[in-house]
Amino acid sequence: MSCQQSQQQCQPPPKCTPKCPPKCTPKCPPKCPPKCPPQCSAPCPPPVSSCCGSSSGGCCSSEGGGCCLSHHRPRQSLRRRPQSSSCCGSGSGQQSGGSSCCHSSGGSGCCHSSGGCC
């Protein structure tokens, strides 16, 4: 064996490339933000319903101006009038069909059973 051959044998082997691939990035994406809350199944009630109810004489829907019906209970009659006839128009302070109404600009446009606006 010549000196040159023995030197080649003593040299460290060339650096091998690693067989394993580098560490993979996680398959899952980063934690997602929480899902949006489920949407309401029914539309939210008009704000007048929060202070007007049957105890305060009853209220018409916001389409009728958000007015209260008269706190005096109507007499039972065979001919029943539609509820909308007892409502005031939006922003109206006039009485219509015996109902007491508040201006929409003053308070929330509804009345207490005593007659005062909310």
UniProtKB/Swiss-Prot annotation:
Comp. bias intervals (Basic residues): 72-82
Keyword Transferase in record: no
Native organism: Homo sapiens
SUBUNIT field: Interacts with CYSRT1; the interaction is direct.
UniProt feature, compositional bias: Pro residues: 11-32
Keyword Ribonucleoprotein: no
TM segment ranges: none
A Pfam family it matches: LCE
Annotated protein name in UniProt: Late cornified envelope protein 5A
Single biological process term from Gene Ontology: keratinization
More about this protein: Belongs to the LCE cluster present on 1q21.
Gene label: LCE5A
InterPro entries assigned to the protein according to its UniProt record, in alphabetical order: LCE (IPR028205)
Biased composition (Low complexity): 1-10, 97-118
Region (Disordered): 1-32, 72-118
Family affiliation: Belongs to the LCE family.
Main function: Precursors of the cornified envelope of the stratum corneum.
Gene Ontology molecular function, alphabetical: identical protein binding
Alphabetized UniProt keyword annotations: Keratinization
Tissues of expression: Skin-specific. Expression was readily detected in adult trunk skin, adult arm skin, fetal skin, penal skin, vulva, esophagus and tongue. Not expressed in the cervix, rectum, lung, colon, or placenta. Expression is observed in the heart.
